C-alpha cells in the first residue's frame, strides 16, 4: 500500500510544492521578494529533499523511522506554511500545504492505525485488498491534460475497489469503525489523485 502513497506524493505533492519554492527563489530577485524570502524558499527545498529521501527509505515496520518521517513532515509543513514570497496564489499555496498534511496523515494512519486490519486482510488473502490501487492506471504516462482529467473522472468509480469492494472487505473483516476511519483518510487524500468525486454513496 505504501507504494501508491509514494506515487501520490511524487505526482501530486512534491511537484507542486517544489515548483512553488523554486519560483520563490527565482522571484527573490524581483521587487516583490527579499533576499530573506529567497533564502527561506531554498530552505524549504532542502527540507523537501530530506522529506523525499525519508519517503523513499521509509520502512513501515520501523517505529523509529516513522517518528523521523513524522518530524520531517511537520518541518516541511511548517516551512511551506510560512513561505511568503511565491507567484502561487494564497489558495494554491494553501492547497499544497494541506496536501502535505493529508499525505503525511495517510502514511501514519496506514503504518500505524490501519496496520492490524491490513494484517487481517492479508491473512485472509483478500483479492479486493490485494488488487486495490486508487491511482488511475498509467496516468503518470499520459501528458494530455484532457485525457488525464478523463482518466481521473473514471477513477472515481473504482477509487475504493471494483464495486466499492473495500467497504465490504474492511467492514466484514475489521468492523464499521475501521472502515469509517479508512474512508475518511482516503477521501481526504483523493483530491490530488482523482477528480472531485462524489463519495456521498458511502455516507
From Swiss-Prot:
Q: What's in the keyword line of the UniProt record?
A: Glycoprotein, Secreted, Signal
Q: Where in the cell is it found?
A: Secreted
* Tagged with keyword Glycoprotein: yes
Q: Which GO terms describe its cellular component?
A: extracellular region
Q: Where is the signal peptide?
A: 1-20
Taxonomic superkingdom: Eukaryota
Residues annotated as glycosylated: 32, 84, 188
Q: Which Pfam families match?
A: DUF19
Q: What does the similarity note say?
A: Belongs to the UPF0376 family.
Q: What is this protein called?
A: Excretory canal abnormal exc-13
Gene name of the record: exc-13
